[in-house]
């Protein structure tokens, strides 16, 4: 049995949710209603995120990237955690509902690109269009956009020990099929609502400590 780690990006690897930061800085006021409808699950993640980015003019591309480079912070302990999983031959994937134009630059030098799965953006028109290269498979009908549970099924074997690390509603479907969940923020609420066992965390030092214990117990 091997351990597979599937980790969210926004609000998990980074301290802040970069999509929400973009919306607060660059989107018109109507973005707030769309965000609330996503969190209440009135809108699917795919529908809601598409609507949010359709509110952002493409001519802000360079300004948005510069803003994120200046404001995004990598969560404490992440660098050491990546070193730990690499040293222990643990498979690590970033499965992010974030966008290629900021996920790749912020993880450059930390995670190989082939281990990162995120959404794609098109800046060729007046407003940003989101493309969805990792849709739901036949076992998921939640219109996730980037379907984390489908990616877990694609990238791993059913006999693997699946660990999901996340913070929000976008991680819920993945958490439902994980053997171990590390949760913070809104994902804690959703895990409790859905009776999903989880371990809370604030830094990746917390995750690493628990993973060391798992290595001793599970392997």
Swiss-Prot record:
Keywords from the UniProt entry: Amino-acid biosynthesis, Hydrolase, Methionine biosynthesis
Species of provenance: Bacillus cereus (strain ZK / E33L)
Cysteines paired by S-S bonds: none
Keyword Amino-acid biosynthesis: yes
Listed name of the protein: 2-hydroxy-3-keto-5-methylthiopentenyl-1-phosphate phosphatase
TM regions (residue ranges): none
Annotated function: Dephosphorylates 2-hydroxy-3-keto-5-methylthiopentenyl-1-phosphate (HK-MTPenyl-1-P) yielding 1,2-dihydroxy-3-keto-5-methylthiopentene (DHK-MTPene).
GO molecular function terms attached to this record: 2-hydroxy-3-keto-5-methylthiopentenyl-1-phosphate phosphatase activity
Annotated pathway: Amino-acid biosynthesis; L-methionine biosynthesis via salvage pathway; L-methionine from S-methyl-5-thio-alpha-D-ribose 1-phosphate: step 4/6
Lineage start: Bacteria, Bacillati, Bacillota, Bacilli, Bacillales
Biological processes per GO annotation: L-methionine salvage from methylthioadenosine
Catalytically driven reaction(s): 2-hydroxy-5-methylsulfanyl-3-oxopent-1-enyl phosphate + H2O = 1,2-dihydroxy-5-(methylsulfanyl)pent-1-en-3-one + phosphate
Gene: mtnX
InterPro entries: HAD-like_hydrolase_phosphatase, HAD-like_sf, HAD-SF_hydro_IB_MtnX, HAD_hydro_PyrdxlP_Pase-like, HAD_sf
EC number: 3.1.3.87
Similarity comment text for this entry: Belongs to the HAD-like hydrolase superfamily. MtnX family.
């Amino acid at each position: 049995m091997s351990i597979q780690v599937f980790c969210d990006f926004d609000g998990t690897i980074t301290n802040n949710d970069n999509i929400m930061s973009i919306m607060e800085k660059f989107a018109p006021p109507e973005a707030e209603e769309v965000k609330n409808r996503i969190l209440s699950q009135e809108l699917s993640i795919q529908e809601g995120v598409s609507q949010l980015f359709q509110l952002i003019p493409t001519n802000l591309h360079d300004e948005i990237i510069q803003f994120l480079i200046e404001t995004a912070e990598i969560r404490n302990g992440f660098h050491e955690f990546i070193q730990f999983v690499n040293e222990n031959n643990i498979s690590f994937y970033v499965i992010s509902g974030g966008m290629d134009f900021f996920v790749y630059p912020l993880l450059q030098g930390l995670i190989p690109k082939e281990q990162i799965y995120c959404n794609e953006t098109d800046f060729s028109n007046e407003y940003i269009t989101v493309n969805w290269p990792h849709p739901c498979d036949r076992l998921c009908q939640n219109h996730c956009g980037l379907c984390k549970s489908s990616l877990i099924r694609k990238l791993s074997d059913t006999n693997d020990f699946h660990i999901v690390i996340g913070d929000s509603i976008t991680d819920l479907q993945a958490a439902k099929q994980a053997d171990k969940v590390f949760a913070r923020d809104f994902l804690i609420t959703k895990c409790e609502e859905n009776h999903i066992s989880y371990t809370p965390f604030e830094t990746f030092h917390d995750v690493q400590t628990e993973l060391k214990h798992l290595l001793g117990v599970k392997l």
